């Protein structure tokens, strides 16, 4: 199969040796041989100096001639016609070069910068002796397209509507319908737009360079076939002279992979009807609000078995996923990256189309419908966003104009050894602006409620995952990536200024200080941070046989030492159920009963621990196998009442978490947590209070061994003289698949001092279970 690059190369004129057999054509007035050769061989960097309307000086005292030159390789005939279709001039071919030229009548309107003064009628061979006629305005009759302010903001890295400035804009220019193409490629020798409308021939539509900014532009009228739905790319002659064919960095629509072309997006905006949600989402995402996130890989959440296991599109996902997630009581859906990415096995974490939802699941408007349906169901939408690195696919950003434009030239700064990807040059204004504009595209134009920024740790440290001789210190000799810090601070500041109520979340796996501190206090400015330390410590604890847990008691307690140093989300994410790590259930020790009991206890511990919640799909019903992005979760397990019990527990945990302020209002404040028993290593028992803003407590007791414990005394605070505490949740309940050992729904308060409190309760602790009590 011939690629776009092969086709574009194949359409070049004959080699010089073959062309030398034909006599050189006579040159039209005002054109020299070198310029003609550069045009016909695709090397012309300034096409507007040759093509379109021009004034030619004549003998002294005579009126200057007005001529038109048009380049249409393969055309039989080209005419300049007036708006009524009358022939103004027959353009003569310049040999077999594809260039046509002719003189406009002296009384014709001035065509320079006024495309309506004439049109071009091009006659093409159509096979079997037939002809095809194409009529359109001349792309080279249009004046400058982008305004000075646009170019200034692009150069400064502050054009937040970049996808409405660069790229492909279906629009009217000088009252002519068509598509305005623009791309930043400051070091290219020549840039052309190629696509369905010009047979992917890079000689046909070379673009104009706006000097000083590195932006190339061209308006292609609709009469030439350019419009919404047209496939296109940019063909460049790089700084090194090599031919490159690149997808549009700011394309708002793409072909479905493995195809790699960009697609002209529909200019009509989506008609949103989620104003009520947008006005209230700030309150739904504050630190004192309940946030329970269901993490989803859109391509594998559910497969269409009747259609060969095909992934669902956005509309089908909206019908199935949204009611499922809302029915379980989650507050948010978090989508693994949906920006266009060439390799499905990257799960979206190696994107190249940072402004376009992946065409795997439908057009951009289908994604907008999905988001709106989430909002109608009172679900927030968080999208994973990847500004840390990008893949080196030849159609992408790598050496975009023949130089290291988006990345660092030095591989010690620009190459990520773990992922074989390239690292953005955060010190370059245009690159920072490109990335921030991408973030705003998702938040402003797709109404996304939050961005989870991937791999922040890899951005913050110049020596991240590198040996000592493979990194470059910063200007102070340190390991901190100061340019990345400045970028993250600027990104967060701009997002919060332009998108009220939207949140940003950092996946940051180190102890970098102030990730969620305000930028004005030298923090990074994120709203939340994934608590990777809590996740690793607690999972390691739960993986141990209960008989050994007494020796690793701090696996569950240590997280409280730093639980309020940042605003945390507790993540049981996709990263913990892949690459041989097994599923959450698979990590639990013991026989089938013990594994399920361990999982239930762990989920309840997480839901009652300070911090917002995140759970990856499949974890909510105890999937047996680890996640496979080519297959759906093991939904058949819900035929087993034990797995339905885990799912029921997640539903009830969400309901309790959302309804009880003590469990969420102070998730990020130390006043919302107090240990009662944190040192009972021998029994692996933990007891703690969660408190709302009024100080009203809930008591959580966890027994992390399979040994039931009767008569376990726990000190409790005096709450308005209450004489009993109610059992609000017990993970050993029969409805969850447990043994149904508990306290009959209530425990009495006794005037017996314990654990520093004047009063106490005696609780029956079921095996491998968590009990939640409330006055």
From Swiss-Prot:
One BP term from GO: glycogen biosynthetic process
Residues annotated as catalytic: 454, 507
Presence of the UniProt keyword Transferase in the record: yes
UniProt region (Disordered), positions on chain: 1-39
Disulfide bonds: none
Protein's pathway: Glycan biosynthesis; glycogen biosynthesis
A molecular-function term among this protein's GO annotations: hydrolase activity, hydrolyzing O-glycosyl compounds
Biased composition (Low complexity): 8-24
Domain of life: Bacteria
Entry keyword set: Carbohydrate metabolism, Glycogen biosynthesis, Glycogen metabolism, Glycosyltransferase, Plasmid, Transferase
Family: Belongs to the glycosyl hydrolase 13 family. GlgB subfamily.
Complex and partners: Monomer.
Record function comment: Catalyzes the formation of the alpha-1,6-glucosidic linkages in glycogen by scission of a 1,4-alpha-linked oligosaccharide from growing alpha-1,4-glucan chains and the subsequent attachment of the oligosaccharide to the alpha-1,6 position.
Matching HAMAP family: GlgB
Protein name as catalogued: 1,4-alpha-glucan branching enzyme GlgB
Source organism of the structure: Ralstonia nicotianae (strain ATCC BAA-1114 / GMI1000)
Lineage: Bacteria, Pseudomonadati, Pseudomonadota, Betaproteobacteria, Burkholderiales
Gene: glgB
């Amino acid at each position: 199969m011939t690629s776009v690059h092969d086709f574009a190369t194949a359409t070049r004129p004959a080699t010089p040796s073959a062309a030398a057999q034909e006599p050189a054509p006579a040159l039209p007035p005002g054109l020299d041989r070198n310029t003609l050769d550069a045009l016909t061989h695709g090397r012309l960097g300034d096409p507007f100096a040759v093509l379109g309307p021009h004034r030619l000086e004549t003998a002294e005292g005579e009126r200057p001639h007005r001529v038109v030159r048009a380049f249409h390789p393969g055309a039989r005939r080209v005419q300049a016609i007036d708006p009524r279709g009358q022939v103004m001039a027959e353009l003569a071919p310049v040999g077999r070069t594809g260039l046509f030229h002719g003189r406009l009548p002296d009384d014709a309107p001035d065509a320079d910068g006024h495309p309506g003064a004439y049109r071009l009628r091009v006659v093409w061979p159509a096979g079997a002796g037939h002809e095809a006629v194409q009529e359109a305005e001349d792309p080279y009759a249009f004046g400058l397209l982008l305004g000075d302010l646009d170019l200034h903001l692009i150069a400064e890295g502050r054009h937040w509507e970049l996808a409405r400035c660069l790229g492909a804009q279906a629009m009217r220019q000088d009252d002519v319908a068509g598509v305005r193409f623009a791309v930043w490629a400051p070091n290219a020798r020549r840039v052309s737009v190629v696509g369905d409308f010009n047979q992917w021939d890079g000689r046909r539509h070379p673009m104009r360079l706006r000097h000083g900014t590195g932006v190339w532009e061209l308006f292609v009228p609709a009469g030439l076939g350019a419009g919404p739905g047209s496939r296109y790319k940019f063909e460049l002659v790089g700084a090194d002279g090599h031919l490159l064919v690149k997808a549009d960095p700011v394309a708002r629509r793409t072909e479905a992979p493995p195809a790699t072309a960009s697609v002209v997006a529909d200019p009509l905006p989506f008609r949103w009807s989620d104003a009520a949600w947008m006005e209230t989402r700030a309150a739904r995402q504050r630190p004192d609000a309940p946030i329970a996130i269901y993490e989803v890989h859109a391509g594998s959440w559910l497969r269409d078995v009747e259609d060969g296991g095909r992934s669902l599109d956005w509309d089908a996902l909206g019908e199935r996923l949204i009611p499922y997630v809302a029915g379980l009581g989650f507050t948010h859906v978090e989508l693994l990256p949906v920006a266009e990415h060439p390799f499905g096995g990257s799960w979206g974490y190696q994107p190249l189309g940072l402004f376009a939802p992946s065409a795997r699941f439908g057009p951009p408007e289908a994604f907008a419908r999905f988001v709106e349906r989430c909002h109608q169901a009172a679900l927030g939408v968080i999208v994973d966003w990847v500004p840390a690195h990008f893949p080196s696919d030849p159609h992408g950003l790598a050496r975009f104009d023949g130089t290291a434009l988006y990345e660092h030239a030095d591989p010690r700064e620009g190459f990520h050894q773990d992922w074989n990807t390239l690292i953005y040059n955060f010190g370059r204004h245009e690159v920072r602006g490109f990335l921030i504009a991408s973030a705003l595209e998702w938040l402003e134009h797709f109404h996304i409620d939050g961005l989870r920024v991937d791999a922040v740790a890899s951005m913050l440290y110049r020596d991240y995952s590198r040996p000592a001789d493979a990194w470059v210190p910063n200007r102070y000799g340190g390991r901190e990536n100061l340019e990345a810090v400045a970028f993250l601070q600027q990104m967060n500041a701009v997002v919060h200024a332009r998108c009220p109520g939207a949140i940003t979340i950092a996946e940051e796996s180190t102890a970098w200080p102030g990730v969620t501190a305000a930028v004005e206090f030298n923090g990074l400015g994120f709203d939340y941070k994934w608590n990777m330390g809590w996740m690793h410590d607690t999972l390691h604890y739960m993986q141990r046989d209960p008989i050994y847990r007494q020796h690793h008691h701090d696996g569950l307690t240590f997280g409280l030492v730093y639980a309020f140093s940042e605003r945390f989300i507790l993540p049981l994410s996709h990263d913990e159920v892949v690459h041989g790590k097994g599923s959450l259930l698979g990590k639990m020790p013991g026989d089938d009963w013990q594994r399920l009991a361990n999982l239930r206890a762990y989920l309840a511990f997480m839901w009652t621990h300070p911090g917002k919640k995140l759970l990856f799909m499949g974890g909510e019903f105890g999937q047996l196998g680890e996640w496979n992005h080519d297959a759906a979760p093991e939904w058949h397990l819900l035929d087993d009442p034990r797995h339905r019990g885990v799912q029921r527990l997640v539903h009830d945990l969400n309901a309790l978490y959302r309804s009880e302020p003590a469990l969420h209002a102070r998730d990020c404040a130390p006043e919302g947590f107090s240990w009662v028993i944190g040192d009972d290593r021998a029994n692996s028992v933990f007891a703690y209070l969660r408190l709302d803003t009024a100080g009203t407590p809930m008591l959580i007791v966890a027994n992390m061994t399979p040994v039931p414990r009767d008569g376990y005394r726990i000190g409790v605070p005096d709450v308005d003289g209450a004489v009993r505490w109610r059992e609000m949740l017990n993970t050993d309940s029969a409805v969850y698949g447990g043994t149904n050992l508990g306290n009959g729904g209530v425990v009495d308060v006794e005037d017996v001092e314990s654990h520093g409190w004047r009063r106490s309760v005696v609780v029956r602790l079921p095996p491998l279970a968590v009990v939640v009590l409330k006055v």
